[in-house]
Amino acid sequence: MKSKKLFFTLFVAVFMAAALLFLFVGNVANVYASQTQETINWNMKDVWQNKTSRDVPAFATYDAMIECAPRAGFTALGFYDYEYPELLTGDVYEGTNVVNNSYYAFYDEYKELMELMKQLSTGVTVRNFKKGLTEYVERRGRSVTFTSVMSKGTADLTQCIFAFAAQKPVVMFLDGFRYVMHHEEVANRDTITYYTEEDVKHAVLVYGHILFTYDYTTRREYYLVNSGYRGNVKMPIDSFLDVDDAYIIDIT
């Protein structure tokens, strides 16, 4: 799908976290964030995008730093509630537009998912993330499958793009990343402010991909994510992105 701007979009719903324990996703300890800024002057800018046809809900939670894994799972539930309204009580969507981004509206279900995932002060293991989400979905008469998209130590972008086209989000478990705090587009200049998180654990629900090309040569690729404390942001696909594990989530 080509537009005047050459746009590929890999949107993610991101959930910030850090951890001391390697197997755990989500803990406030050991986080380091640095800020950098990049300015790109251009004569022509193209953008390509590929994303699910509807956005994911941006559920907020009390503790964004340790609840990233249940938040990622709960966002997947909200996304699939569009097709299977028995997953959550209340309305998440009106048409394809998200009308309820408050987890307080689904408090009982969120707490149930946290308990099923065995949420601890150190976070949630990938194994318990999958087991907890599976049990939650099966209690409501549905099933969930997890298909790995890992290849050569990272998430395979092509598999992810095919998943988005099939209306399936991808959960990623990260050991490091950075995200766009601000992207200003004025005249023929893009100014991008990045925050880098190193030595962290963090869970992300990805639902699209975006590629900017400037003057045919300079490329910037991103996952668009929901960060919990920053809302929807772009997460660069670059050397800072360290994917430990990743799965397509398919609820039927």
List the predicted regions and their residue ranges.
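N-terminal secretory signal peptides that target proteins for export/translocation
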Residues: 1-4
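Catalytic cysteine-centered active-site loop
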Residues: 96, 139-155
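Sec-dependent N-terminal signal peptides of Gram-positive bacterial secreted proteins and lipoproteins
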Residues: 6-27
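Active-site signature of cysteine proteases
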Residues: 157-158, 165, 174-252
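Substrate-binding/catalytic groove segments of enzymes
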Residues: 84-86, 140, 144, 212-218
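Active-site-adjacent structural segments surrounding the nucleophilic cysteine of cysteine proteases
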Residues: 24-126
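Extracytoplasmic/secreted envelope proteins and their assembly/folding machinery
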Residues: 65, 69-77, 130, 134, ...
